[in-house]
Amino acid sequence: MTDEAITAVAGLVASFLSGLLGIGGGLVLTPFLLYLPPLVGGVAIPVKIVTGLTIVQAISGSALGTLRHRSYGNVSSRLVWLMGPPSAMAAVVGAFLSRDLADNVILIIFAILAFAGSIMLLLPVTPRDEPAEDIRADPRLAIPIALVLGFFGGVVGIGGIAFIIAALVYILRVPPRIAIGSSLGIGLFAAVAALIGKAATAQIDPPLAAIVFISALVASPIGAAVSVRTQPRALLAILSVVVMLAAIRIALTAVAGS
């Protein structure tokens, strides 16, 4: 099985989950592309190239997912514009610095973010039924969260989306469904900025990036459509499991390579 075919399959699965759960897809795409190619006769894809591909997926998947979630009234424009720009600025810095980081350091950062996000997503949440346009967030909390997660997202290529959702729900008290939709818009800012940094430091493979982009066009809107028919608590539980599994696998690889 060629790397191109593996990338296409991984891109479809990741983009579906991106639209469904608001995670940007990188949490699924990263383990797929790191471990599957050698197992099925393909060529191992370098870690830095994989992180570049997750950013491409995040841009296409997040853009389409945001539009679909917005049509359902699940995107807070106020949150997106409050947290998106600072996240983008920090993501550029993280993407440039990632060029000089060892692969296992990048994987460790990925695993820490994923573990923290998955644990937060298991915490009980107070049900809220508030329209997206009425959502308010304290800038003194929202902007620092965006800066920190944007920076680390620029390093590892996933935009810190899973942790952004957890922060929106448990720190800023945003209803889960709106947190999922808004996180895609916030992540889009960071992903575009991080792509600039990754491309400038030769961490993008154009043919594989094109495959990931096309896969997102197909699968992300389908995931978003399924999301609105799923209970918010169930979405958070599914997201937590996906994030935890990815974190465990990545952490084992990082420890073995250190």
Model-predicted segments: where are they?
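Juxtamembrane transmembrane-helix boundary motif
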Residues: M1-G24, V28-I49, L64-V155, Y170-I171, ...
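Hydrophobic/aromatic end-of-helix segments at the C-terminal termini of transmembrane alpha-helices
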Residues: L29, G160-I164
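Membrane-embedded alpha-helical segments of transport systems
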Residues: L53-A63, M89-A90, I186-A193
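Short hydrophobic/aromatic, small-residue-rich stretches within specific transmembrane helices
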Residues: T54-A58, G84, S183-G187, L208-A209, ...
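Short, contiguous, pocket-lining structural segments
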Residues: V156, G160, L184
